[in-house]
Amino acid sequence: MAVSCNHSAILFSPSSTAGSSSVTSSSSLIGFPRFQTLRFKSRSVYSKSRVSSPVSALPLRSLEALIFDCDGVILESENLHRQAYNDAFSHFDVRCPPSSSESLDWSLEFYDKFQNLVGGGKPKMRWYFKENGWPTSTIFDSPPQNDDDRAKLIDTLQDWKTERYKEIIKSGSVEPRPGVIRLMDEAKAAGKKLAVCSAATKSSVILCLENLIDIERFQGLDCFLAGDDVKEKKPDPSIYITAAEKLGVSVKDCLVVEDSVIGLQAATKAGMSCVITYTSSTSDQNFNDAIAVYPDLSNVKLKDLETLLQTIVTAA
């Protein structure tokens, strides 16, 4: 079970089930700004003060390495991708369905759901056009009828979209998510290992990191892995297992910051603890296996994460 945290205090109210509690947020009640997590086989208990571990408890974990995902964690990238797609549709006057009076424009509400339904840029467009009709455009005056022409349409749109996305990232208008830079600097100052592990292509991640966290911080990472560096992508745990090996740190002493259930699954399968900073497109996902859930990292300090990791107690 995960603790869901927002900018207001963490509050506790009795639930209808004996021996359990529910978490509530309200400025009108007494808040608990710090908590520890005891994880048992049957249930989880949250407490403000330290609670003695069961005799059978395994050794406490120690935060030795902090690992960040990139898209969704360091930057909220999905809306930027949506903007780049819509700019491509406008540039090539993509009409879908062909009878439409205006170029295609994916709304924020639609894209939040769509990007969790179909992964990858080209598969997204292919799926959408198959469902809604292959479009007219300045690339093809009439809807493409054969596989080669359809592939050319999608390739052209994707290539233009990719370059547009790079322009947006380089524009200086994109900011990292709240608290990310401060938390990275805290970890480095405390002598913790720092890594970024992303399922995206290496060139895309490098572009984002150099422009958002700056080149000096990027070069100061103890480990950087992208989707190109492992055979299987998340939710396969390979990228996190490889990171632990390169960092020289036990998986149990690593803490991962993710934004989606796919990333959470990759971290937990690797044997690592994970906290979630959700986005608008992932907020409804099931994060029960995370040790904490936040809307962002603005109020999260390194000592908070150390306390979380140190007080995870698993019944033997």
From Swiss-Prot:
Q: Which GO terms describe its molecular function?
A: hydrolase activity; metal ion binding
**Could you point out where the transit peptide sits in the sequence?**
1-46
**GO CC annotation terms, alphabetical:** chloroplast; chloroplast envelope; chloroplast stroma; plasma membrane
Q: Does the keyword Metal-binding apply?
A: yes
Cofactors demanded by this protein: Mg(2+)
**Record's InterPro entries?**
CbbY-like, HAD-like_sf, HAD-SF_hydro_IA, HAD_sf, PGP-like_dom2
Q: Where is the active site?
A: D69, D71
Q: Which UniProt keywords apply?
A: Chloroplast, Hydrolase, Magnesium, Metal-binding, Plastid, Transit peptide
Q: What is its main location?
A: plastid
* Protein origin, superkingdom: Eukaryota
Tell me its EC number(s), please.
3.1.3.-
Subcellular compartments: Plastid, Chloroplast
Q: Give the first-level EC class, as a single word.
A: hydrolase
The entry's Mg(2+)-binding residues are D69, D71, D259
Indicate the family of this protein.
Belongs to the HAD-like hydrolase superfamily. DOG/GPP family.
Name of the featured protein: Haloacid dehalogenase-like hydrolase domain-containing protein At4g39970
Q: Origin organism of this chain?
A: Arabidopsis thaliana (Mouse-ear cress)
- List the taxonomic lineage: Eukaryota, Viridiplantae, Streptophyta, Embryophyta, Tracheophyta
